[in-house]
Structure formats: structure tokens, C-alpha cells
From Swiss-Prot:
The gene is TTC36. It comes from Bos taurus (Bovine). One of its GO terms (biological process) is tyrosine metabolic process. Belongs to the TTC36 family. Keywords: Repeat, TPR repeat. This is Tetratricopeptide repeat protein 36. TPR repeats lie at residues 50-83, 85-117, 122-155. Pfam families: TPR_2. InterPro entries: TPR-like_helical_dom_sf, TPR_2, TPR_rpt, TTC36.
Length: 188
């Protein structure tokens, strides 16, 4: 019938309400999240100021003021240039502004600073995977979503199911069958 992973993907398609952890065969080797205690790495006053600037930036971005958001993220980065979170968040604002190259540059920096671990890395892999998917680079997207899924991202797990060619085929066949069932008998 297929590999255990293929069977797990089919299980996820036909039983979408099942938690991914309960799907036999879908073993992504989830890594325990190892979050660095930033309070031990960065001076407390600078860390608090950096977080406050990031919060201001997020609020500005949510209000649609991307230029202010980018300015605040830049200030947070200048304050603590070795802190991954601000790069990750600025990447999102840059992407929303249409600066995909700048977003990817920030994501690379965030992933390097995070060491590929923790919440910031999980978000960075998801963002980079989304950019790759939008650019039609599905293999790169799959690799990033796999890394994010191992770090505990349910969104990345759903993206992996959607990127699976068997899932795409099953979804297409299921849509065809459902379309036929919805048509009146005389049209079939």
C-alpha cells in the first residue's frame, strides 16, 4: 500500500481531527525545545528595552504601519544584535512589505543566532518554508517545515501533509468524488 509515512499522511487526510501525535507512522522525531534563558545571556535592562521595542513594532505592524514596525525592529536589533527574535520578527514585516530578499536575509540570521533551536527557530523555519513554497521551491519548503515540525509546529505538520504528492492526489480524487455526489442523478 505504501510506506508507513504514506499511510500516516492518508490517515491525516481522512481523519483531519486526529492529533498528529496520534497518527501511527508519522514520526518526525520531535526534538525537545531547548529555549535559551535570555536573561542569562543578555543584560537585563537591554533585554527589557529590546522586548519593548519589538512589542511596539508588532503593534505597529498589526496596525498596518510597516515603516514604524521596521524602524522599531531595527532599533531592537541595534540594541542587541545577537538576539534572534527581532530578526525573525523583522523578516515577517519585510515580507509583508514585499522585501523577500531582506526577509530571507533576516531569517538566515535569526536561524544562525538561535542555533536552530527553540521558539524563534521554529518560527523562522516556518517563515522560510512559506517563502520557499510561494517561490515554488517545494523541496526547500519541505525541509524547513520538517525542521519546524520537529520543533513542535502544528502548522508545519499541516504544510507537510499538503506538500505530500499522495495527499495532493487523494485531495483531488476526493474533490472529484464529492463533486459527482453533489450533482443531481440525471447529470451524471
Amino acid at each position: 500500500m505504501g510506506t508507513p509515512n504514506d499511510q500516516a499522511v492518508l490517515q491525516a487526510i481522512f481523519n483531519p481531527d486526529s492529533p498528529f501525535g496520534d497518527i501511527v507512522g508519522l514520526d518526525l522525531g520531535e526534538e525537545a525545545e531547548k529555549e535559551v534563558d535570555e536573561g542569562e545571556v543578555f543584560p537585563r535592562a537591554q533585554l527589557e528595552q529590546s522586548k519593548a521595542l519589538e512589542l511596539q513594532a508588532v503593534i505597529a505592524a498589526e496596525a498596518g504601519d510597516l515603516s514604524t514596525a521596521l524602524e522599531r525592529f531595527g532599533q531592537a536589533i541595534n540594541l542587541l544584535p545577537e538576539r534572534a527574535s527581532a530578526y525573525n520578527n523583522r523578516a515577517q514585516a519585510r515580507r509583508l512589505q514585499g522585501d523577500v530578499a531582506g526577509a530571507l536575509e533576516d531569517l538566515e540570521r535569526a536561524l544562525a543566532l538561535s542555533g536552530g533551536r527553540g521558539r524563534t527557530a521554529r518560527q523562522g523555519f516556518v517563515q522560510r518554508g512559506l517563502v520557499a513554497r510561494l517561490q515554488g521551491r517545494d523541496d526547500d519548503a519541505r525541509r524547513d517545515f520538517e525542521r519546524a515540525a520537529r520543533l513542535g509546529s502544528p502548522f508545519a505538520r499541516r504544510q507537510l501533509v499538503l506538500l505530500n504528492p499522495y495527499a495532493a492526489l487523494c485531495n483531488r480524487m476526493l474533490a472529484d468524488v464529492m463533486g459527482q455526489l453533489r450533482r443531481p442523478c440525471d447529470e451524471r
